[in-house]
Every structure is written in structure tokens, then in C-alpha cells.
């Protein structure tokens, strides 16, 4: 939880409702963990851009997940992914699921929501986090989606299909 506090703060400002149920240490005793309960929430786009910063700022690995979250927030969200050259280009893949995006340049994308995502067949982007956000968006899309070339996801997330199915996904 120590490295997600800023992300949770941004989500709270967007209207995300959750409750911390339990705080505890990881098995090795070095990391603080929590169990969360989430509640249905009406999200609103933040007035400021969402961008990663060095610690204690928003973690660069978590920034792409705000792109799929922005598809469900009322208003327009600016995601500024300045660290990785051209990674924001991969966020345009959300359009195949009927997201409403506008790529300003290879680092900045505007996402307008809320959007009712629809099933589609998509080839997985080669970058891990953009591939993961397509998978997450597909889980929230109406209908049955097909995600091809999932090597990057399998490489980066151990047993992801089993873990998501345990949470109620149908993959």
C-alpha cells in the first residue's frame, strides 16, 4: 500500500469508493499490504493531467491503468506518459473497444467518458502495461472479446488468467 497511496488519492478524487478492510505485512515482513473492498462508484475526470513522477509521485508502471479508468469517468482526462517514447500511442487500441480517445502526440492522450465499451478482437500491443489495459478494458466490455498475441501479458503477469478467473472473470 505504501507505493499506491497517490494512486488511491487520485482515484478518491475521481469519486472511487473503497474501504480498507485489513492491514498486514507481506510474508517476508518488508511490505505493507491491505485488503480492499470496492463499491460501485460514479467517476469524474480530474481537472489536471495524470502523469507519472519520480517517487513519491505516481508510479510510471501504474499510469497506463488510468487510461482504462478514464474511459469510465465523466469528462475528459489527459494522460501524459512522458517517460516512455511513444507508449501513449498504444492507448489508442482502446478505440477498438469503442473508447473515445484523442492522441495529442506520442506522449499525451485525451480520453473522454464514460464510455460503454464493446467487445472486439484486438492484437495485443508489444508493451506490457498497454497490453494489460486492453485486457482489463475487455473484461469490462459488453460481449465476448478476443485478445491475440498475449505473450507480453503472460511474460509480465504470472498466472494472470487463473487469478482473474478466481475474481469472477470468464477467460
How would you label these PLM feature ranges?
Residues 1-171:
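Short, structured segments at the rim of ligand-binding sites
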Amino acid at each position: 500500500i505504501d507505493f499506491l497511496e497517490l494512486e488511491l488519492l487520485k482515484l478518491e478524487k475521481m469519486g472511487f469508493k473503497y474501504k480498507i478492510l485489513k492491514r498486514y505485512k507481506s510474508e517476508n515482513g518488508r511490505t505493507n499490504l491491505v485488503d480492499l473492498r470496492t463499491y460501485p462508484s460514479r467517476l469524474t475526470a480530474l481537472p489536471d493531467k495524470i502523469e507519472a513522477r519520480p517517487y513519491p509521485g505516481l508510479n510510471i508502471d501504474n499510469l497506463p491503468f488510468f487510461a482504462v479508468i478514464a474511459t469510465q469517468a465523466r469528462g475528459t482526462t489527459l494522460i501524459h506518459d512522458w517517460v516512455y517514447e511513444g507508449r501513449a500511442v498504444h492507448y489508442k487500441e482502446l478505440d477498438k473497444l469503442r473508447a473515445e480517445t484523442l492522441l495529442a502526440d506520442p506522449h499525451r492522450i485525451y480520453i473522454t467518458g464514460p464510455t460503454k465499451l464493446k467487445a472486439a478482437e484486438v492484437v495485443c500491443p508489444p508493451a506490457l502495461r498497454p497490453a494489460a489495459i486492453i485486457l482489463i478494458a475487455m473484461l469490462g466490455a459488453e460481449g465476448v472479446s478476443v485478445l491475440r498475441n498475449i505473450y507480453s501479458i503472460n511474460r509480465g503477469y504470472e498466472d494472470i488468467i487463473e487469478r482473474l478467473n478466481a475474481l469472477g472473470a470468464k477467460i
